Amino acid sequence: MRLVILTLVLGLVVLTIGAELLVRSASKLAVAAGISPLVVGLTVVAIGTSAPELVVSVQSTWRGQPDVAMGNVVGSNIFNVLLILGISALIIPLRVSQQLIRFDVPLMIGLSALVWGFAWDGRLGRIDGALLVTGLVGYLTLAVWKSRKEQAAVNAEYESEYGATSTISIGGMVLNLLLLVVGLALLVLGARWFVDAAIVLARQLGMSELVIGLTIVAAGTSLPEVATSILAAIRGERDIAVGNVVGSNLFNIMGVLGLSGLVSAQGVTVTDTALQLDIPVMVAVAFACLPIFFTGHLIARWEGVLFLAYYGAYTAYLVTAATVPQFNRTYEFVMLTFVIPPTAITLAVAVVRDARKPAASRTDSESSEM
């Protein structure tokens, strides 16, 4: 057991280092090649934070472990919203931009529901994967087109994170190429160790590969998003903390699940449990973002606590279902009777009250939260 846990942790460390090397070297090479920091930020850097999910899911599907791939994406999306935004909102109430409310969050809801529909026949096939990847290309193209007017701000943000955008020497290019190759190799190696250890751990604990994917693998591969969002909240960059999570979830659905569906002739199989519980939870979590984001365009601290409580409840259900199945009925009854309805009523009242506020008082309320 100790060796398995050590391999799991080591694989995660190698995976994270590989992702960091890949993002930094690819970003500098892209800028040196004349690609604008705006495009780099929307593609290389954004995709880089989800590189662990991508490599783990594609590799798992390729090696005949689709439950890990599906569990990783679904679990990561649930983890990103409930845990990462929950912790970030506890640090400081998070600002939500109009762009997210009007476009990105509805898109996240629609894509989550679309995946549920695709999975209804028990698998995510190559056609489904191709449609999702095509959607990602369209989304990135639209994002680049819409963000060109913010070019100066994006350049400044890129330079503060990755350094000046000046040209680099031949030696610098060779070094970054080597770092790119090393980063990619570490990603693949770390993913192999991480997935292998997770599978062994699941069997030793008597849990399914799906549950391990939804919990340990999902949490581990989401570490770049954890670091980015929490650091942004601490620095007071509250819109970045929210945008990072929503953007990561969109890429997980379109990019990670899409490519996972493409690499296997059989596609990504979807278990009845995932179809009846975990994917609906992902859809519900995405949908819950809309009323919470809408109220004052802020995620308040009490809403952060609510997110954390629900993630704890969901994780507890997964663990009890795998280890003490006789408690499932009681747990479901308590959640459906005493927890979910009061929460839904509270959110509905908050939305109605916020909608009835005059614009001036709403602005004052936002200022008092800051």
Name each region found by the language model.
Residues 1-370:
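Hydrophobic alpha-helical segments, chiefly the membrane-spanning helices
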